[in-house]
UniProtKB/Swiss-Prot annotation:
Record protein name field: Molybdenum cofactor guanylyltransferase
UniProt keyword annotations, A-Z: Cytoplasm, GTP-binding, Magnesium, Metal-binding, Molybdenum cofactor biosynthesis, Nucleotide-binding, Transferase
Species assigned in the record: Methylibium petroleiphilum (strain ATCC BAA-1232 / LMG 22953 / PM1)
Pfam family, one: NTP_transf_3
InterPro entries, alphabetized: MobA-like_NTP_Trfase, Molybde_CF_guanTrfase, Nucleotide-diphossugar_trans
Keyword match Transferase: yes
Length: 203
């Protein structure tokens, strides 16, 4: 059994926020607190230690009380940059990533990913859930919700340094367990309008 104390949680807040007009998405208010802090508070009970991957307004993120690390890849590899930061900085055998813009992810997310990874002797485990853009019941991978063995660091460094940017192309090189979830907890806010709508739809 993979205990929570063996897992480092990483909140991914290093994106450019282009679909939100360039604002720092993780600092946008959701139910009165910043999105990234909401994600952090939801993640902390599920793991042993946490950190945030951010590239702007670092002092604001540091005020949340956990380590904040910017991307080490100057070419901006997207979410994989956050994966890389987590694997480089973690002192645990496992790392789990969650994006800052999906504030209502399940409170048993990490436990279910860990169970599947161990049961299938996989190198990583990720969420699979229906997407709002798909037909009802059509699940697809949600790769930013991912539990990884820390031993994958060398593989990811090679992939990113070779110009790789797509998560699915990297994960396809490894044994990956898919864990099915309902769609609702994974609704994310890509625009400010979607964020306001999410606030009114969730109780």
């Amino acid at each position: 059994m993979i205990g929570a104390e063996h897992i480092t949680g990483v909140v991914l807040a290093g994106g450019r926020g282009s679909r939100m007009g360039g604002v720092d998405k993780g600092l946008q208010p959701y139910r009165g607190i910043p999105l990234a802090l909401h994600a952090l508070m939801r993640l902390q009970p599920q793991v042993g230690t946490t950190m945030i991957n951010a590239n702007r307004n670092l002092a604001a993120y540091e005020s949340f009380g956990v380590p904040v690390w910017p991307d080490t890849d100057p070419d901006f590899a997207g979410p994989l940059s956050g994966f890389l930061v987590g694997l480089e900085r973690a002192e645990t055998p496992f790392v789990v990533t969650v994006p800052c813009d999906t504030p209502d992810f399940p409170d048993d997310l990490v436990a279910r990913l860990a169970h599947a990874l161990e049961a299938e002797d996989a190198e990583l485990a990720m969420v699979r859930a229906p997407d709002s853009a798909d037909a009802p019941g059509a699940p697809r991978p949600q790769p930013v919700f991912c539990l990884l063995r820390s031993t994958l660091l060398e593989s990811l460094v090679r992939f990113v340094h070779a110009g790789g940017r797509k998560i699915d192309r990297w994960t396809a090189q490894h044994r990956c367990a898919m864990v099915d979830f309902d769609a609702a907890p994974f609704f994310n806010a890509n625009t400010l309008d979607e964020l306001r709508r999410l606030e009114t739809q969730r109780v």
